[in-house]
Amino acid sequence: MAYYQEPSVETSIIKFKDQDFTTLRDHCLSMGRTFKDETFPAADSSIGQKLLQEKRLSNVIWKRPQDLPGGPPHFILDDISRFDIQQGGAADCWFLAALGSLTQNPQYRQKILMVQSFSHQYAGIFRFRFWQCGQWVEVVIDDRLPVQGDKCLFVRPRHQNQEFWPCLLEKAYAKLLGSYSDLHYGFLEDALVDLTGGVITNIHLHSSPVDLVKAVKTATKAGSLITCATPSGPTDTAQAMENGLVSLHAYTVTGAEQIQYRRGWEEIISLWNPWGWGEAEWRGRWSDGSQEWEETCDPRKSQLHKKREDGEFWMSCQDFQQKFIAMFICSEIPITLDHGNTLHEGWSQIMFRKQVILGNTAGGPRNDAQFNFSVQEPMEGTNVVVCVTVAVTPSNLKAEDAKFPLDFQVILAGSQRFREKFPPVFFSSFRNTVQSSNNKFRRNFTMTYHLSPGNYVVVAQTRRKSAEFLLRIFLKMPDSDRHLSSHFNLRMKGSPSEHGSQQSIFNRYAQQRLDIDATQLQGLLNQELLTGPPGDMFSLDECRSLVALMELKVNGRLDQEEFARLWKRLVHYQHVFQKVQTSPGVLLSSDLWKAIENTDFLRGIFISRELLHLVTLRYSDSVGRVSFPSLVCFLMRLEAMAKTFRNLSKDGKGLYLTEMEWMSLVMYN
C-alpha cells in the first residue's frame, strides 16, 4: 500500500547494527577507556579484498588521531569546507565529490555530522547519519584509522593533520557498505542519495541541450547538490590526462557564471577535484592563470578568479560539455530542466517502503510487485518521476551483478480499475509499456516521464533470489494547485478585527436574517475567502459539516456569534496552511502533523500514527494533496471530536454512550 511520509519517518533514527551511540559512549566514559568497535574492527577485514596488495596490506597499522604527528586533533577546525577533503588510496571520488557539494549545504550537513569533538566527552567514538531507503540510519565508529608511515591510507586530514571529520565520515560510510573496498569505484547517484535522501536529475551533457549556467543557478537556489563525471579513458581506471582532467572521475560543481569577455559574454563553470591539489586541475581555457582571465574586464574578476592549488578551477561551458559526460543534480524535489530550466515546486510524493520481491531461481515466471498511480491532468514537460533505491544488504549488493537487480516497467492501465494485483493476462493483452529500465548496477535509479492523464501501474521484477527496495513516485501538480496561495483573498491576512469586515460580510449573506445556512455559508466562503478554480472551493457538503461542527442550537444554521468563532478559525487556518505548505499553494498529506502542531486551537491534542494515516487517506486527493477546504474540515473536526470526548468522559480515559447517543453524535457531525 502506498503511504505518504509521516513524522515518524523523518524523526526516527535507525541504529545501524543496533549500536546506540549514547549508551556506548557513556559506558566508555564510566570505565575510563576509549571505544573499540568490534563490528568494524581495526583489521584487514574492514579494509576488504582487492583494494591493497597483500604486501602493502601487511604494513597497515591503525591509529587514533591524537597518535598521529601534528597538532591536537579537531573534529571540525574553523568551519566545514570542500577544501577539508583530499582523496586518498581508495577510488571513492564518487563519494567525496558528493560530500564536497554537501559542505555547501548546511541543511544536509547538519543531519549527517552533528556536534562532536575530541575534547568534550571524548571516548574515541563518533557517529554519522546516512539516508537509507526512506529512513536515516546512524552509524557508530571508533576513531582508529588505517595508516602507513603515519599517513592516513584513505582520506587525508588537512591543516597539518588537525581536522578529521572527512576521515571519520569516510570510515562510517565504509562500515555502512561493508568495507573500504566497497568505496573503491561507485556511482555518484548512490552517494548523493545516501547523503540527502533526495531525487536525482541526470543531465547527459553530450545530448541534452541545457543552459548550463541557468541550470546550475536554478539547482543551487533549490538547495541541490551538484556533481559531474568524466568518461572513461583507455583503461577502466582513473588516469590523469594532459589537459589536467582525470578520466573516469567525479567532480563537484561549485558554480556557473556568464562573464564579460572581449566584446561579448562567455559562460563558464567552476569545478572541484576531490584529489585536492593543483596538478589535477584543468589546463585549458579559463583555467587558473590563463589568458582569458588576463583579458577579461569583468568587474567580478577578482572575486571569481582566485589562483590556488586546491583542486578548484574554472572552464568554459563549451569545453565542459565536450570533456564531461554527465551532470547530476540531487534535490528534495525533482528538478526538471525541460522548460527553460524553471523550477517547478509543485510535486506530490507517493512512497512504497520496504518492498521485497522473492525471486524464482528454479525457473518459470518471475515474481513481480505492482504499484498503481494516476495522472490527473495534462501538462507540458516531465510530469512523473519514478525513483528506485535498493537496500544496502549483503543479499542485494553483489559485485558480480552487471545490471540493476530489478527490472521496472511503467504500463498504461487504460480504463482498468485499480486492484490489488493485475493478473499476467492483463500484461499480455494490453502491452501498453511506457518505458522499461535497462541499466548497469547501482543502488539508485531514476526514470522520468511525460505521461498523459490516465491510470498507470509500475511493475517490478527481480533477476535473482530476492530484492528489498524503496519506490518513490513523484507527480507534478498543475499550476493552479501550485499557486493556490494567490487564491486567498489578501484581506484575510490580518486578524478579523484588523480588516473589520466580518460583521458586514455576515450581514450581506444573511439577507436581513439573524443567521445563515450551509448554502449561504458556501457562497460566503467561496466569494470572500477564496478566489480560485472550482476544485479549490468549499463544497456544499463541507459547508454542512462546518455548520454542524460550529452551531450550538442544532438547527442547521449559524448565528452571528457562531459565525464569528468560525471566521476566527478560518483566518488562523489560512496562516497555518501558508506556513506549512511545501511550496506556494501545495500542502502534502505528509505534512498534516505539522498543521496540527501549528494550530492554536489544538493545543494538548495528540493523535496516533495509525489515526494520522487514516486521516491522510480521508482528507487528501489521489496524489497526496490537501486542499485548503479539506484542511479546514480536518482541523475543525479534530478539535470538535477531542472536546466532545473530554466533555462526555468522566475519567478522561473512556466514555459510555447509548446506541442512540452514539448515532446522533457521529451521523450529524
Curated annotation (Swiss-Prot):
Name the SMART domains for this protein: CysPc
Any Pfam family matching the protein: CAPN13-like_C_EFh
A cellular component annotation (GO) from this entry:
cytoplasm
> In the Enzyme Commission scheme, what number(s) does this protein have?
3.4.22.-
- Check the record and name the InterPro entries matching this protein: Calpain_cysteine_protease, Calpain_domain_III, Calpain_III_sf, CAPN3/13-like_C_EFh, EF-hand-dom_pair, Papain-like_cys_pep_sf, Peptidase_C2_calpain_cat
Q: What positions does UniProt annotate as the active site of this protein? A: 93, 249, 273
What family does the entry list?
Belongs to the peptidase C2 family.
Q: Does the keyword Iron-sulfur apply?
A: no
Q: Which CDD domains match?
A: CysPc, EFh_PEF_CAPN13_14
**How is this protein named in the record?**
Calpain-13
> What role is this protein assigned?
Probable non-lysosomal thiol-protease.
Q: Which SUPFAM superfamilies match?
A: Calpain large subunit, middle domain (domain III) (SSF49758), Cysteine proteinases (SSF54001), EF-hand (SSF47473)
EF-hand domain location is 538-573, 636-669
Taxonomic superkingdom: Eukaryota
What organism is recorded for this protein? Homo sapiens
Name of the gene this protein is made from: CAPN13
- Which key words tag this protein in UniProt? Hydrolase, Protease, Repeat, Thiol protease
Q: Tell me which Gene Ontology terms the entry assigns under biological process.
A: proteolysis
Q: Which residues form the Calpain catalytic domain?
A: 34-333
* Tissue expression: Weakly expressed in lung and testis. Weakly or not expressed in other tissues.
